[in-house]
Curated annotation (Swiss-Prot):
It holds the Pfam family zf-C2H2_7. GO terms for cellular component: nucleus. This is Zinc finger protein 750. The keyword Protease does not apply. A zinc finger (CCHC-type) spans 25-51. It comes from Xenopus laevis. One of its GO terms (biological process) is positive regulation of transcription by RNA polymerase II. Transcription factor involved in epidermis differentiation.
Length: 674
């Protein structure tokens, strides 16, 4: 509207011209007419039909009758069944007169006053001609009714109404009946669109309602038949069925497949037009799958569905009570199949009361089972100690409580008492695969370091490496089996002693390796300690070369290898080992989940304190890497008293003793106090 005003401040184009004017252009949807095509274009462009309709409806009440008469008379003259050439000529003259009158009225805005005049003129003109008064009345009254029906549609119905108009001209009683309609016609003209819908709806809505009424006839039985059969029994179970059907039915593989077909009947049924055939296609899938199984078990299906559906959530042996009609065997076997995912627990074979206990025990037993696979132990041996208190990791790995679980060492109780306590902790940690792996890493790295330091590193290193692995594995599982298996440890010690006799360099590292093996495994014995004491002098002589050897750096690959870095140097002797192992290697072992390296026998410790004071003077050269590692380990040195002392004795090195003797004693005393 604003754009139109800006372009042309003329009178609005969308207002229809005065009724009598011959219009070249007319709107399809509304009574708007204009001689200028651009006006009609704008009218259509801006959707001004509403405005024109409102204006026309206001004017129709006043002016439209003359306009309609002129228009309709022109149209009737064109029709083949027009009354006669005389009335057509009269209508043309009358229309011209009305056009002139209407133009003047529109310009002067005297439409209301001029309407009766034009109406009277129409009647006089029509009466002057030979038309009979009823025919004239029909001409005057009929067009508005026809126009009322004709104008709103402007499409197909117009021709029909014109045909009706010709037929009505022939019969006077019809004209009189139509003459009663002008009021209706005028009212329908108010909105050019509303007059059409009333007959249109009346014609079409009735069949629509008939169709709709027929549709609910089909839909209602569908909806009514649906819920009782499907939603109560089949619908909900179908969702949960894959676990439940094998329970309820005796291990039928088809049931898990058919659980989805249960849902399939939902989709086709609403599509089926008639309600009566519904139960037949519904029953067809039921008869294939259910008639033999579920229809026999209808009461059981509810329980089988609603109770066991919880089963997948209690996958570990917490078996939901079986359906009342089902034997426990069926349910348990059927529930096994989904739960094979969890091999450790066999929940189906456990009744609900026993499920917690047996599962707990079985899960405890599983780590030893894995240990069996590692060490190829017999099942009975590995499982023997698993649930017992000795293997329970009550104390923290850093500070295991030695007093909680004391296991009597079989052959060596008398040697030292603390070894048993540390053994219990070692058993605890041996249970843990992570700690076991860490111990293996430490021992392996220690052996590698000692071999690297030794001249015979090429072959012996590999052997000792493999031996260290086997020894630690055996030790871990021997601890789980029995409090102490010193048989293999004694063998290792004997091997190491023989090696020390044969190769002095190799013996130093071998003894260090032995002690590394013995300490985490609590195999330190006075006999072995005395043997090492005899060897200490030789080892001291040999150590400077070994400690300074560069390969020590290779051991610093993992956090667990801190002990190895110092342990390669530890081959001084048990005297020196007691000092520095307590400081460094034990710290690394504590970091290894405190695999409870066996405390050196107290007798040896008591024998060595004087020698320990002497040792720092004797031992001088040392690799800087070993010093750094020792300082780090000493700073990290932690709460394990006896295990620390043994580990520290392993980490002894000459130069570090000369430098840090005071610090080492302080660290040594701390673990002793604890």
């Amino acid at each position: 509207m604003s754009l139109m005003k800006e372009r042309k401040p003329k009178k609005p184009h969308y207002i229809p011209r005065p009724p009598g004017k011959p219009f070249k252009y007319k709107c399809f949807q509304c009574p708007f007419t204009c001689n200028e095509k651009s006006h009609l274009f704008n009218h259509m462009k801006y959707g001004l039909c509403k405005n024109s309709i409102t204006v026309v409806t206001d004017q129709d009440r006043i002016i439209k009758n003359p306009k309609v008469n002129s228009m309709d008379q022109n149209q009737t003259s064109n029709e083949p069944f027009a009354k006669s050439s005389v009335p057509a000529i009269n209508s043309s003259l009358e229309s011209k007169m009305l056009h002139s009158v209407a133009r003047e009225e529109a310009k002067e805005n005297l439409d209301l006053k001029n309407e009766p005049k034009s109406h009277a003129e129409k009647t006089t003109v029509s009466k002057e001609f030979t038309l009979s008064p009823p025919v004239a009345i029909s001409q005057i009254n009929k067009p508005p009714s026809l126009d009322g029906v004709m104008r709103p549609s402007a499409f197909i119905p117009v021709g029909e109404h014109r045909v009706k108009k010709g037929a009505e001209n022939r019969t006077i009683p019809e004209l009189t009946s139509i003459s009663a309609e002008p009021a209706k016609g005028v009212h329908s003209i108010k909105s050019a669109f509303h007059s059409l819908p009333t007959p249109w709806k009346s014609g079409l809505v009735s069949p629509d309602f008939s169709q709709k009424s027929s549709i609910p006839r089909y839909i209602r039985p569908m909806i009514s038949e649906y819920p009782p059969q499907f939603y109560s029994e089949a619908g909900l179970p179908a969702v949960f069925s894959p676990y439940l059907f094998p329970q309820t039915e005796c291990e039928n593989p088809m049931l898990s497949i058919y659980s989805t077909p249960d849902q399939r009947p939902y989709l086709p049924h609403p599509l089926q037009p008639s309600g009566l055939p519904l139960p037949k296609p519904i029953n067809a899938p039921f008869e294939h799958y259910r008639l033999l199984q579920q229809f026999q078990q209808n009461p059981q299906l509810h329980y089988g569905f609603y109770r066991p559906t919880e089963h997948p959530y209690f996958s570990y042996g917490l078996k939901v009570p079986p359906a009342p009609g089902l034997s426990k065997e069926h349910t348990s076997q059927s529930m096994d199949s989904p739960t094979f995912i969890y091999p450790s627990s066999h929940p189906s074979r456990l009744y609900p009361l026993e499920g917690f206990q047996k599962l707990f025990e079985i899960q405890k037993e599983t780590p030893p089972v894995l240990a069996k696979n590692l060490d190829s132990k017999s099942d009975s041996e590995s499982v023997k100690m698993s649930p017992r208190a000795g293997s329970a990791a009550t104390g923290s790995p850093e500070r295991p409580s030695p007093t909680n679980f004391t296991q009597s060492s079989q052959g060596h109780e008398g040697i030292f008492d603390l070894s048993t306590k540390s053994i219990s902790t070692s058993d605890k940690i041996g249970k843990d695969f992570t700690s076991g792996k860490a111990m293996r890493k430490s021992t392996d790295s220690q052996t590698i370091i000692s071999r690297e330091n030794s001249p015979s590193f090429g072959n012996d290193g590999v052997q000792s490496h493999s031996e260290g692995i086997t020894v630690t594995d055996d030790a871990v599982h021997d601890d789980t089996i029995a409090p102490l298996n010193l048989s293999k440890k004694s063998e290792v010690e004997s091997r190491d002693i023989v090696d020390t006799v044969n190769n002095s360099d190799f013996t130093n590292e071998r003894v260090g390796f032995m002690e590394m093996q013995d300490l985490p495994l609590n195999l330190s014995v006075k006999d072995s300690g005395s043997n090492h004491n005899t060897l200490c002098a030789d080892e001291r002589v040999l150590l400077p070369r070994q400690s300074t050897s560069p390969p020590v750096y290779q051991a610093i690959q993992t956090t667990d290898n801190r002990a190895p870095t110092t342990t390669g140097i530890h081959s001084l002797g048990i005297i020196e080992n007691c000092d520095e192992q307590k400081q460094s290697a034990a710290v690394a072992l504590c970091q290894l989940a405190t695999s409870s390296p066996g405390v050196p026998p107290r007798g040896t410790e008591d024998e060595f304190p004087e020698k320990e004071t002497v040792v720092p003077e004797q031992v001088q050269p040392r690799s800087p890497a070993a010093q750094e590692t020792e300082t780090d380990v000493g700073a990290r040195g932690q709460k394990r008293t006896n295990s620390k002392e043994l580990g520290k004795s392993q980490s002894s090195t000459k130069k570090q003793k000369a430098v840090d003797s005071g610090r080492m004693f302080t660290l040594r005393k701390r673990p002793r106090v604890s």
